[in-house]
Regions:
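Polytopic transmembrane helical bundles with strong interfacial aromatic enrichment
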Residues: 1-161
């Protein structure tokens, strides 16, 4: 096995750990802590700032996952021709990879909506004191949970590869 391949796999796993670990930490540690009454005055601003901070980290690791994923597939002997001819998707390994990539694209799409539309829009509405902000906040929270679950499903598929 090539040292570069092993490094790429290691980097891929590290990026996945940062992505999933950060979402789980936010959901099981940060959000429950901020729900305590003494944090009510700073809750919204704190979550928004954490979201902004995580956004660049999250998109960096997602980009790293895509790049290392492509490199890892290349090291397994597949090229762009295999991708477009359908050869990459043959057999159990290829079908598992296909499902993993579908979920990755779904997570990236949901993350884009969450990070670049819902989060900023919710803050605008909250700053204006509009009642619809709470509904958008709930949708953003739901999407965050959905991304976590989909990311865990991606991890399960990765183990099968």
């Amino acid at each position: 096995m090539s040292g570069w391949y092993l490094f790429s796999v290691w980097l891929h796993i590290l990026a996945a750990t940062v992505w999933i670990g950060s979402m789980i930490f936010l959901g099981v540690a940060v959000v429950p802590l901020l729900r305590r009454p003494e944090f009510a005055p700073v809750r919204t601003a704190m979550l928004y700032q954490l979201g902004l901070r995580f956004r660049w980290i999250g998109w960096t690791v997602l980009l790293l996952l895509v790049i290392t994923g492509i490199v890892n597939i290349g090291y397994r002997g597949y090229g762009w021709d295999d991708l477009f001819s359908g050869a990459l998707w043959q057999g159990p390994w290829g079908r598992t990879l296909a499902w993993k990539l579908v979920l990755v694209l779904l997570v990236m799409g949901i993350s884009a909506v969450h990070d670049f539309y819902l989060g900023p829009r919710t803050m605008q509405l909250l700053e204006r004191g509009e009642a619809s902000a709470e509904q958008l906040r709930r949708v953003a929270s739901y999407l965050g949970r959905l991304m976590t679950l989909l990311s865990l499903a991606i991890l399960a598929l990765a183990v099968l590869l």
